Amino acid sequence: MKNKLLLTTAIAGLTAITGFAHAETKLSGNMEQTFKASSIDSGDSGRGLGTEMNIGLSSSKDLDNGLKASYGFNLEFDADSSDSTNDVYFMTLSSGNISFSVARDNGQNLSSTVVPHISDQAGTVVDGESFGNVSTADAHNYDHVRLDAKAMGGTLTLRYAPDASNTYAGDSAIVDSGQSNSEIIYSGNLGVDGLAVQAGYSKLKANGSSNEDIKYDKYGIAYNFGQFAAGADIRREDSGTVASKVEKEAVRYGVTFAANDNLSFGLSYQETEKKTAGVKSANDEETILVGVGYNFGGLGIDLNYAQVDNLGHTANKDAEFFQIRTIQKF
C-alpha cells in the first residue's frame, strides 16, 4: 500500500511538471504542397510539384527583473533539399507595450500586404514578375535588431540589420559585407475597427561607390465591410548603379468575398511601371489574379489563376499561371 501511494505521488508530480513544461514551450508545424502550371508566350512553359515543411519551437518566461523573455526558431525542410534550414529565429525582451528583439525573418515586414487576397500574392504565383513581393531592401530577412512599440492602434517597428549578406545560420565570426539595412514600419487600424493600414520605408546601403543605395517604400490601406473586404497599396523601389538607376512602381487593388466561414473568393489587379536611367519602359506589366480558398478544418486548399500582360515589361510576352496549394497545420 505504501509503495502504491509513493508511485501515485510520483506520477502526479510528473504530470504537474509535464503540464507546466507544455504551458511554457510550444511546438508547431505545417506542411505545404503546391502544384503550379504556366504558359508563357516566347518563353518557358511547364508544370511541377513542390513541398515545404516547417517545424517550430518557441517558449516564454517571466524574468526576475520584471521583463518577459520570448524565444524560438523554425526549421524549414524543402522537397528538393536533404538538409533543413534555420531561416527563422528570435529572442525578444518585452515590458508592457515595448519590446526589443534579435531575430531573422521574424516580426512585421514589408513583404506582407493589407490588400485582401486569397493565399499567395501575385508575386508568388507569377514566376518572373518584374516587382515581386520581397524587396532586396527588406531588412526583415536578415539578421537584425528590432524595437517594437504598440501605439496608434497598431505596431511601430524600427529595425537595423548590420550585414545584409547574413540570411542563414552563421556564427559571431561572420564578416561584415558593408551593406547595412535600416527600416521603419507601421501597421494597424489607427483605432478604427475594420481598417487596416501599412506604411514603411527601408534602405539598403550600397556596396561600393558605383552602386546606388536600394530604397523601398510601401503604403497600403484596406477596409473590411463584413463579408466583403477591399484595399489598395503602392510600392516603389530605387536600385541599380549610379550610371543606370532602376526605378519601379507597382499599384495594386484587391477585393475578397467570404461566402461563409470556410469559402472565400478574391480578385486583384496590379500594374507595374519601370524606368531605367530615367527612361520609362514602353510596356507596363499588368497582372490579374483570381483566387478561391476553402477550409476543410484540418486541411486548407486554395486555387489561384493569374493572367499577365507584358511579363517583365517585354512587349507581347503574355503569360498564364495556375496554382493549387494545400496546407496542413499541426
Residue ranges and their predicted role:
Residues 1-330:
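Outer-membrane beta-barrel proteins
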